[in-house]
Amino acid sequence: MTDVTVKALAAEIQTSVDRLVQQFADAGIPKSADDSVSAQEKQTLLAHLNRENGSGPDKLTLQRKTRSTLNIPGTGGKSKSVQIEVRKKRTFVKRDPQETERLAAEEQAQREAEEQARREAEETAKREAQQKADREAAEQAKRDAAEKAKREAAEKDKVSNQQTDDMTKTAQAEKARRENEAAELKRKAEEEARRKLEEEARRVAEEARRMAEENKWTDNAEPTEDTSDYHVTTSQHARQAEDENDREVEGGRGRSRNAKAARPAKKGNKHSESKADREEARAAVRGGKGGKNRKGSALQQSFQKPVQAVNRDVVIGETITVGELANKMAVKGSQVIKAMMKLGAMATINQVIDQETAQLVAEEMGHKVILRRENELEEAVMSDRDTGAAAEPRAPVVTIMGHVDHGKTSLLDYIRSTKVASGEAGGITQHIGAYHVETDNGMITFLDTPGHAAFTSMRARGAQATDIVVLVVAADDGVMPQTIEAIQHAKAAGVPVVVAVNKIDKPEADPDRVKNELSQYGILPEEWGGESQFVHVSAKAGTGIDELLDAILLQAEVLELKAVRKGMASGAVIESFLDKGRGPVATVLVREGTLNKGDIVLCGFEYGRVRAMRNELGQEVLEAGPSIPVEILGLSGVPAAGDEVTVVRDEKKAREVALYRQGKFREVKLARQQKSKLENMFANMTEGEVHEVNIVLKADVQGSVEAISDSLLKLSTDEVKVKIIGSGVGGITETDATLAAASNAILVGFNVRADASARKVIEAESLDLRYYSVIYNLIDEVKAAMSGMLSPELKQQIIGLAEVRDVFKSPKFGAVAGCMVTEGTIKRHNPIRVLRDNVVIYEGELESLRRFKDDVNEVRNGMECGIGVKNYNDVRVGDMIEVFEIIEIQRTIA
């Protein structure tokens, strides 16, 4: 090998020159950068580096886990799954070359020793077999010689005595023949014994050779990984063991049967009798004498199916599935379905049925029914509450209702001396506002409801939670639709009404007109003999505000409103929404008791501990008494507006009740699903022709979601339907955007915005996202989108009328009508009608239009022309030709 310099070697092995010089110095070879390096010096350096750094790892351990599932059959035809984990570990040891050579030499020596032992064993076996065969042959030869001498002596005796006695000779011949046969049989037996000995010797030698080979493979071969499936191998072993067991049983049975046939058992032998009896009993249990039943007979049961029907006590809750009912009655689901079909009800095995239907089916099938009350836990939680006995007077809860823009919020705004209305989008109220006001005569709690038509359900909730309704009517506008609706809500809730005639300061105000209109709906003023107080007010000027408050307090005094102030609180959710920083927030109006910070509350489907309470001004409060509205934080989710709020003792039980209510709501919803009836079949067949506007709706509060959903669903027509794919409270999330993309829906955000992840999905999928803050605009735009889906209306518009004055014959067009245009314009290639005595006799197309032998496109009023009608020759003088065109009119939703 050619010597290289230290610098070149460093470049070749990709290391620095200084490091390589240092390594040479450590190895005892002083070098500089320009010195040459020989092959011997390279080997010396390599050996030094190996000693310093060592080699790779001497031992490597591999671990492997295999997880699988084994299905084990259980009782009742059900099977359970067992998780099985097989762990394998293998260690590889790296040996040095000297150790490897030594082990190879030892293995070679061991193999040679085993081969020598095998050969010696074979030689020994052969030698023993040969010696035994020689001994047998020598003994046989001696026996043959003795037999021969005996035969010769017998023959001599026979010859000597032949003349004397023929009868003796015959007997001797017979005897000799028998002796020959016995000798032949004996010889054959000896040969068979010798053959068996030789086979035994060969078998011993083969066994020795096989054991030697197994030892060799066991000692030398590396253990291989078991790649077979654990469960397949296990089941194969199980089947083999079962087959061997069956073969042993069959063999024992056959042997016992043959033994019985060969020799009858002794009467006095009790052991043999008991053994035979056991065999017979075992055979009877395992399937008798049938040949097919013998296989696997050891695993069969001796259970006999009961012949009589078993009547059971079946416990049925409020709802139950068909499959669960079948399990409780211990019958197959198909039998329950058949019984329901006999009763006239169609059902599937997973369908939820109500308690009455399940009771009828169970009683029809002969079982006793026990009806279970599932709300026992809920009743127990509700009964375990501290409620004080002494009731005290409380402040009235007043709901301000009326038509939109009649000044409800402005009136309350003046009372509270704040500017709330300016903060509402569009100047209209879209939430329920709850406020309490301290006056000189006492405290009053006000609920401000929306007046827009979309917020019917909100107004209904406000009327149910209130004591007194203040009906605001504009003096210049009179009674309007939402005013009438507010009267209906108040009457339905049985709440007294105080009428505030607002905008009394306007010149066009007419309070008497308002009284007359309200009297038509059962609201009569006191001066007319009615029960309602009428107060003239002006929210702008502040006129009559004190009189209105006095009227409210007077009405409250008449009602004698009282509530328990001490003890656990109960109330109602006025409004709820999801705040990004604070979580679910609910506006609660306390009816009884005192709500404290830290109380555990149960609220519809939700529960939680009150972590914080704020009043309507956003100030933290520690407690809230009757008729006080507060915002509470800490619920598990956003409750539905109108839900009952109850303080309970145990959070665990509150959670159980909330989960039970959720499950019950879901089951009831499934049970109410429409059954497949014949009349629905035709309705479903036409659904494919209906266009759908899919909407994913998110709003800031629960009430707005409810109101907008109701308003949009009411827009549906026979041709276009609005479908709310998803709705909720809070900002637009990625999940909402994905849902809208999957269902081809419009994303609508009412006073909410989309987060960053949702915006990415919206941009990627090019979704239609729209933000609104006023409900008018939202409804108008959805109407416009629905109008675009309506098929246009086709309308025929008459553009010209011509009278036939003469008829000419043309070789090209046939009959050509010479006409005078009497109305409008005649256009070529337009559809026409031929009228005779004002009766349409033909409808077709105008093919040829000429004026003085020239083809023209149109002929105006008062001019003559020739008209050729396509595929029609029966034109007569006096006929009228009506030319029209079809125009499309875009339809809109009113």
From Swiss-Prot:
Residue sites binding GTP per the record: 402-409, 448-452, 502-505
Alphabetical list of SUPFAM superfamilies matching this protein: Initiation factor IF2/eIF5b, domain 3, P-loop containing nucleoside triphosphate hydrolases, Putative DNA-binding domain, Translation proteins
Subcellular localization, as worded in the UniProt entry: Cytoplasm
NCBIfam families: IF-2, small_GTP
Keywords, sorted A to Z: Cytoplasm, GTP-binding, Initiation factor, Nucleotide-binding, Protein biosynthesis
KW Nuclease (keyword) present: no
Organism, as annotated: Citrobacter koseri (strain ATCC BAA-895 / CDC 4225-83 / SGSC4696)
Lineage, broadest ranks: Bacteria, Pseudomonadati, Pseudomonadota, Gammaproteobacteria, Enterobacterales
Protein name: Translation initiation factor IF-2
Record field: compositional bias (Basic residues): 254-269
Domain tr-type G per the UniProt entry, residue ranges: 393-562
Comp. bias intervals (Basic and acidic residues): 93-159, 166-219, 270-283
Superkingdom of origin organism: Bacteria
Family per similarity comment: Belongs to the TRAFAC class translation factor GTPase superfamily. Classic translation factor GTPase family. IF-2 subfamily.
